[in-house]
A protein has these predicted regions:
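Juxtamembrane/start-of-transmembrane alpha-helix segments at the extracytoplasmic/lumenal side
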Residues: 216-239
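Juxtamembrane interface at the cytosolic side of transmembrane helices
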Residues: 240-261
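Short active-site neighborhood of thiol/selenol oxidoreductases, capturing the structured segment around
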Residues: 51-81, 98-99
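Extracytoplasmic/lumenal ectodomains and periplasmic regions of secretory and membrane proteins
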Residues: 153-212
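N-terminal signal peptide c-region/cleavage motif recognized by signal peptidases
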Residues: 14-16
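Positively charged n-region of N-terminal signal peptides that target proteins for export
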Residues: 1-4
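Structural microenvironment flanking redox-active thiols in thiol-disulfide oxidoreductases
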Residues: 78-140
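N-terminal "domain-start" segment that seeds a small globular fold
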Residues: 20-54, 76-83
Length: 261
């Protein structure tokens, strides 16, 4: 995961001077459970004032920090997220909302609209399931600081360096999980939404499935507890079998030594 994130940071800062350290400026600090101010005022891509609370409609939010005019990875990140959303059972706009959260305070609704229009053409199912936010530097930082999401401005390239990741928020604005990379795994997104939904979305089957997985904050992925248990059990079995075989060989050698003339 660190290698992937490093690759993404390099894409965002390719050609920058040594004075700017993208690896020092960017990152995600672990702040699971942090509460976001849901009522800060932003603008959506149509120029209407809105808030994260209004965007969520009481459902989980998948928040993707982006630069709407980003020439590098942001378009790929949103396209990857859209593809991931289409590959799992929950429906954007019905079960959850995607917020393309602009981190550049110089951008406005027109920038968000331009980037989302292209996305909606490729993914018509997201037409009502994704919003593009822009806002003031103070309000943007209020959200990113609570999330522990760090990014930096490169004076030479005149653009932001940042990491490709999405934050999954609970309906009441708590940070539930981070999913890393340009295109999260659909199973990971489904599990993260189930967990963040607190029973408000999904079925009992989804809740039971969640019991079979655990979240690894190092990788931003969910792993199967059953598969992990099987691997541990298999390793224990191999060690135990090896010990029994070794003990049997030792006993046989001792018997042969006693029986020798």
């Amino acid at each position: 995961m660190r290698a992937l994130m490093a690759f993404i940071v390099v894409l965002s800062t390719c050609g920058s001077a040594l004075a700017f350290d993208a690896f020092q400026a960017t990152g995600i600090d672990r702040r699971a459970g942090a509460t976001l101010p849901l009522d800060l005022a932003f603008q959506d891509e149509s120029g209407r004032p809105t808030t994260l609370r209004q965007a969520g409609h009481g459902k989980p939010i998948v928040l993707a920090p982006v630069v709407h005019r980003c020439p590098n990875i942001c378009g790929l990140t949103l396209a990857g997220l859209a593809q991931t959303a289409a590959g799992q059972k929950f429906v954007a706009g019905r079960d959850f909302t995607i917020v393309a959260f602009g981190i550049d305070p110089r951008e406005g609704p027109a920038d968000a609209r331009q980037s989302l229009d292209k996305l909606r053409q490729s993914f018509p199912s997201l037409r009502h399931g994704i919003l593009g936010f822009t806002g003031t530097e103070r309000d943007i930082k209020s959200i990113t600081d609570r999330l522990g999401y760090r990014y930096g401005w490169d004076d030479d390239l005149q653009q932001y360096a940042h990491i490709a990741a999405v934050a999954v928020l609970t309906p009441d604005g708590r940070l539930s999980r981070w999913l890393y990379g340009i295109a999260p795994d659909p199973v990971d997104l489904r599990l993260a939404l189930t967990e963040a939904g607190n029973g408000k979305i999904g079925t009992w089957g989804d809740q039971l499935l969640l019991l079979c997985y655990h979240y690894d904050p190092q990788t931003g992925r969910y792993g199967s507890l059953i598969w992990t248990a099987l691997r541990i059990g298999g390793a224990i079995t191999v060690v135990a079998a090896g010990g029994l075989i070794g003990l049997a060989i030792l006993r046989e050698r001792r018997r042969l030594q006693r029986d020798a003339p």
